[in-house]
Amino acid sequence: MAKQKIRIRLKAYDHRLLDASAKKIVEAVKMTNAKVSGPIPLPTERTLYTVLTSPHKYKDAREQFEKLVHKRLIEIIDPTPKTIDSLMKVDLPAGVDVEIKL
C-alpha cells in the first residue's frame, strides 16, 4: 500500500516572511499528529537585470538590479482529513505563494 503524501511548495521574495509561513504550516500539521518533513530550503532563483543609466550614450554607465525568489518545500506524510482542515484554516501573509500537490 502506497503512502499518501502532500507536498507544499512556498515561494516569496522575503525569506523572513517565508520562514514564518513555513513555521505556521508545520505547527498546524503537527497539532493533527501527521508526520512532517521540512521545511526544506530549495535553491534561490536569482534574476539579474542590467540597465543603462543614461538614456542615449555612455554605455559604460550601467546599473544592475536583482530579484531573488526564495523557496521552501514541506512534505506531509499520511495526512488525515483533520490535517487538511487545519491547513485550510492557516492564515498566510499576502507575499507568500503556495502550491499544493497531492
UniProtKB/Swiss-Prot annotation:
SMART domains assigned to the protein according to its UniProt record, in alphabetical order: Ribosomal_S10
Gene Ontology terms: biological process: translation
Record gene name: rpsJ
Oligomeric and partner information: Part of the 30S ribosomal subunit.
Annotated keywords: Ribonucleoprotein, Ribosomal protein
Keyword Lipid metabolism: no
One Gene Ontology term, aspect cellular component: ribosome
Molecular function GO terms recorded: structural constituent of ribosome; tRNA binding
Organism this protein belongs to: Kosmotoga olearia (strain ATCC BAA-1733 / DSM 21960 / TBF 19.5.1)
Known role: Involved in the binding of tRNA to the ribosomes.
Top-level taxon: Bacteria
Pfam families: Ribosomal_S10
Family: Belongs to the universal ribosomal protein uS10 family.
Name of this protein: Small ribosomal subunit protein uS10
